[in-house]
Amino acid sequence: MKIAIEGCMHGDLDNVYKTIQHYEQIHNTKVDLLLCCGDFQAVRNEKDMDSLNVPRKYREMKSFWKYYSGQEVAPIPTIFIGGNHEASNYLWELYYGGWAATNIYFLGFAGVVKFGNVRIGGLSGIYNERHYRSGHFERPPYNESTIRSVYHVRDYDVQKLMQLEEPLDIFLSHDWPVGITDYGDSESLMRQKPYFRQEIEEKTLGSKPAALLLEKLKPQYWFSAHLHCKFAAAVQHGNDGSVTKFLALDKCLPGKKFLQIIEIESEPGPFEVLYDEEWLAITRKFNSIFPLTRRYTNVSTAGTIQESREWVRKKLEERQFKPFEFARTVPAYNPSQRVFDSIPEIPQNPQTLSLLELLGLPYLLDSSPVTGERTDIPASLAPSDLPTYDSEEIPIDDIDEIEEMEEAKADDHTRDDA
């Protein structure tokens, strides 16, 4: 099986697909699957951009809306995770995973699927210690704080992934596992990105939860993005001989190293995305403790999943493990017509409803972030006695902002020298 790996998509689907098709023509081959490591930007219309953590002057519709509307269809099956520049309102609709457009599958905030017999897991978002122990309290419309915190990784989702026992072939994360630079050419990386040096030397560059998952899951491959550079490493796990090949890739821009093709052993095709039995059993077991408020949540003890797994297996066999079909929940962007503001903030996605019905679980995604009860009042209008944070207190966790500052400094030095 030939798999294309892409770093940060930033909504530029057209160019990524064209690049892959060019590769196929040159090498007279067929790529079976595209994996994207976050910052996918599944923006369906103008209103979605209000949930995108990008400075307003840089917000663009890009090309995903064409695939959402059906004007275009992804030429290659595509699986993606979320990063820190996403239409977070749409990804919340698909918290458990699902088709974001025809032939384009979102793994969820955490998730595992099979493509053929290749098992692929992933964790969306980036690590921020402040919100790691919180529940998923954010709801659209987001404010200056929640538009950032909504994509911060939560312990709940990590603990679900930590329950996995069956081997994974591939794992995707947006930010890198902390310490991964010890296993590759860190000196070359620091020459390329000198402002990473302090974090590399202090071993704070990257995600602590991702490092825990790397140690536990030991996938054959681990792919990341976020830091906008290509970096390879190989992690030897103990004495059992298992090795994880790590690769981070850049964003989709001319001259950037944003794409890599790998070949992985697999059964012969045709291939399709399928639900993973073990993962859905874990999802079913953990849903009763799904944390939906700010307060600290300890989710480390959820018990065995065996009984849940047997129940899930019977249900999945009835539908041959196939995910539910893609369904649009809001109008797609139309260059000649404005989207109406009457679109609900949190539409109930039919895929999510169908999956929860299959698993015998309640729908909780429109619950109040304060009480955990369902409400039609937007979270931003709900009363709360919890502290609010000034924007200056919020740490910079966006690599784009860091790069912009460094490029500005470089420009200043150039002007000074001129």
Swiss-Prot record:
Its main location: nucleus. One of its GO terms (biological process) is embryo development ending in seed dormancy. It is found in: Nucleus. Active in presence of diverse metals including Fe(2+), Zn(2+), Mn(2+). Binds two metal cations in two adjacent alpha and beta metal-binding pockets. Its EC number is 3.1.4.-. A divalent metal cation 1 binds at residues 8, 10, 228. Residues 372-418 are annotated as: Disordered. InterPro entries: Calcineurin-like_PHP_ApaH (IPR004843), DBR1_C (IPR007708), Dbr1_N (IPR041816), Metallo-depent_PP-like (IPR029052). Residues 407-418 have a biased composition (Basic and acidic residues). It comes from the Eukaryota. One of its GO terms (cellular component) is nucleus. Residues 124-154 are annotated as: Lariat recognition loop. Widely expressed. Expressed in roots, stems, cauline and rosette leaves, flower buds and siliques. GO terms for molecular function: metal ion binding; RNA lariat debranching enzyme activity. Its cofactor is Fe(2+); Zn(2+); Mn(2+). Keywords: Developmental protein, Hydrolase, Iron, Manganese, Metal-binding, mRNA processing, Nucleus, Zinc. A divalent metal cation 2 binds at residues 39, 84, 174, 226. Pfam families: DBR1, Metallophos. Cleaves the 2'-5' phosphodiester linkage at the branch point of lariat intron pre-mRNAs after splicing and converts them into linear molecules that are subsequently degraded. It thereby facilitates ribonucleotide turnover. It may also participate in retrovirus replication via an RNA lariat intermediate in cDNA synthesis. Plays en essential role during embryogenesis. Belongs to the lariat debranching enzyme family. This is Lariat debranching enzyme. It comes from Arabidopsis thaliana (Mouse-ear cress). The lineage of its organism: Eukaryota, Viridiplantae, Streptophyta, Embryophyta, Tracheophyta. The gene is DBR1.
